[in-house]
Each structure stands twice: as C-alpha cells, then as structure tokens.
Amino acid sequence: LFITMFLKPINRLVNIFEQLQNGMTGFQRFVEIMDQKDETDTGTIEADALRGNIVFDHVSFRYENSDARDVESKVIHDLSMRIEPGKTVALVGPSGGGKTTICNLIPRFYEADEGTISIDGVDIRDLTRESLRRNIGIVAQDVFLFNGSIRENIAYGNLDATDEEIVEAAKKAHIHDYIMTLDHGYDTGVGERGVKLSGGQKQRISIARVFLKNPSILIL
C-alpha cells in the first residue's frame, strides 16, 4: 500500500515531464516558424498561361549558411540549360547533387545567387510569385493528404472541378482502378495524413491532384 502511494506521484511527475518535453519541441518549432523572414516579392508581371519555355543561364546557388567565399559550397554552379515546352526532362545525379534545389528555384522557393532563370523569355524574378506558382504543379516527395475522402483530396487541386474531371485525373495518375475496388469508391476516407493508404497510393492521389490543376509546368 505504501509503495503504491509512493509510486503514484512519481508516475505523475514522469508524465508531466514527458508532456513538458513534447510541449518544448512544439514551442521550438513555433519559434522557428515565427523567426522565418517574410517572402519579399519584387515581381510585378502577372503570368497568365505560361507555355513553359524554361532557360537557366549561368545559374549558381548556395544556401544561406554556406561560406560565400567557397566555390565548392555552391549546390549549383554555373548551370545553363533549356527546357522546351512539352518536353520531359529527367534530372539524374547523386543524393545532394542539387536536383531538388533546381526544382525549387523554378517556383522561386529560393532565389538564384548568380545568373538568371527565365520562362517564356521573362526573368522569373519579374513575375509575381503567386501567378508564377499558379502555373506550376509540384508533386512533393513528402505527400500531404488531409483527413477527408479521396474525392476531396484530389479536388484540392481544383475546387471547381466536376466529378468527371476528378475521375479523369485519377485515370491519368493510374489510381482510378484501385479506387473502384473500394467499398465507397471516391468517397472512401483516407485517414489523418492518408494513414489508410500505402505510400504509392498517396503519391498517385497527389499526382492526380496536380493533373486536375492542369499546370503549364509539372515538377515530379
């Protein structure tokens, strides 16, 4: 009896300590987010429907914590290439070779340190970020699905889409046949962050979402 009475407050203290640790982790993440600088948009040109003629002209980039004097610290160094409209281009290289960084430069998640990136002959820094990103569809490696139905998660790419357009996007992403095997079809819930689906299924739903958006530029 005495041992039980002694252990109860200790267990409470352990639980409080665990909650405090979890709270500190969340608070630290909150501070990191609040410390981030707001994006300054120097672009003034509204991009309508871009054709997708992308040109990298002697582009170099390094992350902020890199040594500016060290050439080897550049993730991308003096890159020049052209991607024509309608073409599919694969970036191949080792991990950390700059493939993801190149993709992140196009929608201006980062700004190039040197050189220029243009789309349809216009420097992307002259385009407003909102209109530029409206023309770009990105399928991230870490797919995010919200706790809703498959239909709702696909429709997030275009909230005004019809059921027929949603089905067509799913067919293009090769996920329609699987969806039709489910008892509730497109109305099947995916769970929090898509927990009820496999990694490949989540990826295909994310691809269907981008197809529904029908962007001028698609980054996978």
Regions found by a protein language model. Give the residues of each.
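ABC-type nucleotide-binding domain
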Residues: A49-L220
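Generic structural signal for alpha-helix termini and adjacent loop/cap motifs
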Residues: I16, Q36-K37, S66
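Cytosolic ends of transmembrane helices, especially the final helix of ABC transmembrane type-1 domains
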Residues: M5-I33
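Short beta-strand segments of immunoglobulin-like
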Residues: T44-E46
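Active-site phosphate-binding and catalytic loops of NTP-dependent enzymes
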Residues: E39-T42
